[in-house]
Amino acid sequence: MFRQEQPLAEGSFAPMGSLQPEAGNASWNGTEAPGGGARATPYSLQVTLTLVCLAGLLMLFTVFGNVLVIIAVFTSRALKAPQNLFLVSLASADILVATLVIPFSLANEVMGYWYFGKAWCEIYLALDVLFCTSSIVHLCAISLDRYWSITQAIEYNLKRTPRRIKAIIVTVWVISAVISFPPLISIEKKAGGGGQQPAEPRCEINDQKWYVISSCIGSFFAPCLIMILVYVRIYQIAKRRTRVPPSRRGPDAAAALPGGAERRPNGLGPERGVGRVGAEAEPLPVQLNGAPGEPAPAGPRDADGLDLEESSSSEHAERPPGPRRSERGPRAKSKARASQVKPGDSLPRRGPGAPGPGAPATGAGEERGGVAKASRWRGRQNREKRFTFVLAVVIGVFVVCWFPFFFTYTLTAVGCSVPPTLFKFFFWFGYCNSSLNPVIYTIFNHDFRRAFKKILCRGDRKRIV
């Protein structure tokens, strides 16, 4: 795949031959001093300690943050949606980078040569490419998942099961392995240094131009292009739906309603049996003291459009409508009396038991149950939007972190010269991406923030939601 002429690649894609320093440069070709003394090191003691401390903090923060993400997804009810398994797999890849790749890249950097032998050199290079590639292929799969959940809301969400998501994750890792395996076929070991000096341990990998370019395209540029196009399309769909009034939206917009139900021409709710699979469509709320056709305001439990009992992107198939347990008995009767329509309301008065036009009669408790379910749906839709935004930020940060490295590496493949210091900076800047996703989740996602707080503050006995 990529050939490293320095003592060894510092990561996923080893530096090209164009970055090879001249022979005898101690920064890259330190050898035994005359008389069997110690090898020269690339950096001074102060610089070495600084690099070790910074890389150590990066590794600790990466492992800690991504372990929190995994625990949060498996323990928080608000994060148990099947598609969050993508985030678990992505976090696992970042943890593996911090534990199996960065430590050896750091040792190679500060020592100036490869110390760990031929076998681990092969494994190290393959794992480095594997984990980096899997990260971007994960993000590509996540972006496609978001696109399908928006454009095929009913059909796709019925198919979005944990088993299906796990199958996609396995496919992601297989694709990544296919990309990272070929370098093992052409890895060679060569001696460094010149003259009669003892050879320095080196680990070199395929540096053929066609392979370098094709690997960069397959590992970064092609998935990146797919993600950008998909999110542009998602943005266009969201913008179009925002501009079109609800009463004029077509079938695509209707798919965003609970169960894919369409609103009746009179604006009072959906027609039953429309767009449902195996269950009746559920009634949409009606504003009792406001403009007709507008949803009723959410209760205290649904403040900020957030239903704490539902997952961030839970399945869109609702339970059939019916009275809620909490509304049976005397309490339900008192609620029914309190919810009677008053003069001036947007709904016409009806006699007891008189069914509305085009819909069977419902009691006050059942009507309130429909309002609550529609409110939960609004909360779920709001979470879908926030989740899509968070993933867009994750993808954007990944591109910002890794694009400089892949761009400069592609330049080296076509013969352009890149300063070694700049090249190494871009590579380590890419490593930093592994630690940033937990920070992004904390800043932009309310559910992750609550889950992290619960995990870190065990004194709070409130249920994780």
Swiss-Prot record:
It is found in: Cell membrane. Residues 313-330 have a biased composition (Basic and acidic residues). The keyword Repressor does not apply. A lipid is attached at residue 457 (S-palmitoyl cysteine). The keyword Ribosomal protein does not apply. SUPFAM superfamilies: Family A G protein-coupled receptor-like. Residues 1-48, 112-121, 189-207, 415-424 are extracellular. Disulfide bonds join 121-203. Signal peptide: none annotated. Residues 75-85, 145-164, 233-389, 446-465 are cytoplasmic. Residues 242-377 are annotated as: Disordered. GO terms for biological process: adenylate cyclase-activating adrenergic receptor signaling pathway; adenylate cyclase-activating G protein-coupled receptor signaling pathway; adenylate cyclase-inhibiting adrenergic receptor signaling pathway; adenylate cyclase-inhibiting G protein-coupled receptor signaling pathway; cellular response to hormone stimulus; fear response; glucose homeostasis; negative regulation of calcium ion transport. The record marks 215, 219 as: Implicated in catechol agonist binding. PROSITE patterns: G_PROTEIN_RECEP_F1_1, G_PROTEIN_RECEP_F1_2. It comes from the Eukaryota. It is a multi-pass membrane protein. InterPro entries: ADR_fam (IPR002233), ADRA2A_rcpt (IPR001946), GPCR_Rhodpsn (IPR000276), GPCR_Rhodpsn_7TM (IPR017452). The modification Omega-N-methylarginine is found at residue 368. GO terms for cellular component: cytoplasm; dopaminergic synapse; plasma membrane; presynapse; receptor complex. Alpha-2 adrenergic receptors mediate the catecholamine-induced inhibition of adenylate cyclase through the action of G proteins. Alpha2-adrenergic receptor shows an allosteric modulation by Na(+), H(+) and amiloride analogs. Belongs to the G-protein coupled receptor 1 family. Adrenergic receptor subfamily. ADRA2A sub-subfamily. This is Alpha-2A adrenergic receptor. It comes from Sus scrofa (Pig). The gene is ADRA2A.
